[in-house]
Amino acid sequence: MYDMFDYLEWRGDLPFKKIGPNPVDMLIFSTLSYINFDGIVSENPNKIIPLREAAEQFLVLPDKEKKVRVKKDIELLEAAVNTERFANVGVSFYRNVLAPEEEKQFAAITYYPGDGTAILTFRGTDRTLIGWKEENDR
């Protein structure tokens, strides 16, 4: 069975300007939205940096494994930014809110693949206590 890593090997050489985003790209963007880019990606939509640059800053963090859902997310980030397709995707408009006293969690990030579109992804329920409570309160 093929996975996102196989897809990156197969189509990683095709920039988004050549072939626009497809469902597998959206899955990759959604998965990457679970990475905690606090202090790396700006909340300001006008301060766009390449995903490669965000990854470089993230990957040197000593506690990076605590800032992801699963370790495979780190591997996916590394694999993605080592492709022509994802390396220069812009990222900004990042927001991560974790407010236990309000039982609130929210996270979103915007990707700019370079084909004239903006892709906004929202992080779903995570494995924090707030996420667990949020899931059970539905």
Q: Positions of the model-derived regions?
A:
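N-terminal low-complexity, Ser/Thr- and acidic-residue-enriched intrinsically disordered segments
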Residues: 1-72
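A conserved cap/lid and substrate-binding interface adjacent to the catalytic center
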Residues: 53-138
